Amino acid sequence: YIDADMYFYSSPEFVFEEIKGKKCSASIIEHRFPNNITRSTNLRLHGKYCVEFNTFFNTEESRKILTWWKKKCFESCSMKLNEESFGDQKYLDEWEKRFGNIHEVENAGAGVAPWNLSDYRLEGKESNGIYLTYKGKQRVKLVFYHFQNLRFLDENTVNIGVYNEIGRKDRALINELY
């Protein structure tokens, strides 16, 4: 599953290699909410995991996960804030407990988004991609960026949504992404 508001800055091949190496039924990506005043509220209302780049293998266990998820989404896929569901994504928080054999993608270059942008700094652009520093210490290659909350206000104006989130942002990184 790939969310429609994402852009790939480099091939996800090494993310697939990570997933294949884990022999899992499915993979999910953490929101990676920054450790700030809004973290616990974001986790409670939006869930630990983001529906953006979910991988499923053609196995019986994977089909069980997909069938259960589909059923839950038919029951409620509301974006109204509550503690039970949020669209199609809060259900992902139950996958590890319910099904096991779920891999949480470790590569921090996958899943960069407005809500976690304050934890990233632009390190540089090289011939093979854009490199970031995650949480001040980990060098990662940008795989994809999730353009959530992008709004066209009129023909010439776009609200990019990154300043709606708490935390200091790297302007050079924002300029590179947008």
Per-region residue spans from a language model:
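Glycosyltransferase catalytic domains, chiefly GT-A lineage
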Residues: 1-178
